Amino acid sequence: MFLTSPFESCIVLSSLIAGLLFSLSTGFVGILGVFASLFETELSVSPKRLSLSSLSWPKTFWALLSSVEGVSWESSLFACIVGCCFAVTVIASLSASRVFGTVASSFRDSSCCCDSSPAVSVLATPATAALALLSLLLSLPCWSTSTEAFTVDPSPSVFSMLANRITIGL
């Protein structure tokens, strides 16, 4: 409806898909390692840290996160880095889609009076908001909880082996 030429819609949609695939490939290994580390260690919830005053959102979320023990500190730090990389790649790729939409509008037929920038905004703004919110939610547990809430697991985890292989590969 908003995209008047097939060339323009193809460029905008392909740039959005490419940005999504790039951001997912950036965070996929890190998220896998974090979940492997979380499920490999025993998780114990301490009811003493939960109080009746922390029943409102987002206090309940913070209290539940701070009551979880057995999560290694390196997995939380890596999840924070993955969340930041995810947000940066998504925002950069969707900004590139706006540039591609502007370039596509210059190649369009001059007889059409419609501008393509509203169409690109209609497609890019909800996708930017949704993916940036997803990346922020992925990295919130690492930013919100203190390092005292995490206990270091001395046994080598799947995350540690993944991190060592990535470091050796680099």
Swiss-Prot record:
Membrane-protein topology: Multi-pass membrane protein
Extracellular face of the membrane: 37-76, 141-170
Compartments where located: Membrane
Parts of the chain on the Cytoplasmic side: 1-15, 98-119
GO cellular component, one term: membrane
Transmembrane segments: 16-36, 77-97, 120-140
Keywords: Membrane, Transmembrane, Transmembrane helix
Other remarks in the entry: Partially overlaps SWI3.
Name by which UniProt lists this protein: Putative uncharacterized membrane protein YJL175W
Species this protein is from: Saccharomyces cerevisiae (strain ATCC 204508 / S288c) (Baker's yeast)
